[in-house]
From Swiss-Prot:
NCBIfam families: NDH_I_N. This is NADH-quinone oxidoreductase subunit N. Keywords: Cell inner membrane, Cell membrane, Membrane, NAD, Quinone, Translocase, Transmembrane, Transmembrane helix, Transport. NDH-1 is composed of 14 different subunits. Subunits NuoA, H, J, K, L, M, N constitute the membrane sector of the complex. InterPro entries: NADH-Q_OxRdtase_suN/2 (IPR010096), ND/Mrp_TM (IPR001750).
Amino acid sequence: MDYSQFLYMKEELSLIAVILILFVVDLLTCPDQKGATPKVNVRSLTLPAVILMTLHTVINLFPGTPAEAFGGMYQYTPMQTIIKAVLNVGTIIVLLMAHEWLKREDTRIKQGEFYVLTLSTLLGMYFMISAGHFLMFFIGLEMASIPMAALVAFDKYRHHSAEAGAKYILTALFSSALLLFGLSMIYGTSGTLYFNDLPGHITGNMLQIMAFVFFFAGMGFKISLVPFHLWTADVYEGAPTAVTSYLSVISKGSAAFVLMTILMKVFAPMVAQWQEVLFWVTIASITIANLFAIRQQNLKRFMAFSAISQAGYIMLGVIGGSEMGMTALVYYVLVYLAANLGVFAVISIVEQRSNKVEIDDYNGLYKTNPKLAFIMTLALFSLAGIPPFAGFFSKFFIFMAAFNSGFHLLVFIALINTVVSLYYYLLIVKAMYINPNEEPIPTFRSDNYTKVSLVLCTLGIIALGIASCIYQGIDKFSFGMGM
């Protein structure tokens, strides 16, 4: 075996090293359930986890040339480096956000488990993104899904968390079964599962169309596209808020990137068929999610339908199947990451301090916690696509990608839905600044880790809006060197 091939997997190997280090540190620092004194006194694993993840991100940010390893099972491209870096940044923010929750007495001794499970999920996404073979893709998918199920049910003594975990596991099992059924059809008609070999065997016959339908349905569950979205609101509401934020951004972003990669590589000969399917799924996702979001009272359920709608917008980048669409997708995920995690950071700290998650509970938040209200407003404006915030530019680029690919009607419908989404995002802004509240959320100070996560999200929203040249940078970095 040529061991130099492992150098192409430096990102995965580096992340495995981070996981092992945190695992060992947790063994040395965490008191057992009987309250015994730990061997090494470390107040929190958050700081070591954040430092290690930051080093991991910086070290692996330097690009290489496109390459394959292990007979084509593993593929490396500069674009993959970017999407992995984006996922790393989101994961770091989630780790910072989770610190306040993990300080609770019932979760304090499980800090190490949370970090190891979170990074194990990220590792699975890495393998999924770099897969050059459907077997590698499926292994990565399951490596991401199984720890995620444990994270969703992490608050096992809360009924809602356990229920959400059960629903997520059942949904993951069902979607994996659909995927495997589709992959078996692909193998049966082509005799191979290598991404580079499959286009020569894809003819668009009826069995391959059925294979695509099952594959797309399985991925639709992962991305929360309509009509595969029914689990989303219940799981988002029941899971711990930090886990919900991770599920809504990191998991969705990686799955969308992988879906586009496979559609462009494997199913390129069936482009007319999958574009038609994606056309209607995109319209349904954006429209139905908007209608349901208007009716929500629980803020986490509200963000669930917002996430479904945003998944529809992300599909605008996928449907064109172009380099411009790929760049727009990555940029959109980056902006969505900053805005969505900003909202969830506010929800998380408010929930920890007041146990309130209803939209009406946020009435008058500006009077008691003006900084939190300001950050929430910036994030919601960005999600709505209001200029000059980053969300406006991300929507502009992804709309242009679809428009240049000839999907003019789809872009028009998406624009109408964007106007509709302004209404329900501004409802929360109205609640915070205008609506009176006899029992408002009390004034409180956030812990330092939460402050850092809020600052990072705020800077991301503002900087990505001002420096829209980042979009060109992503494109040059990725396609200037080869995808």
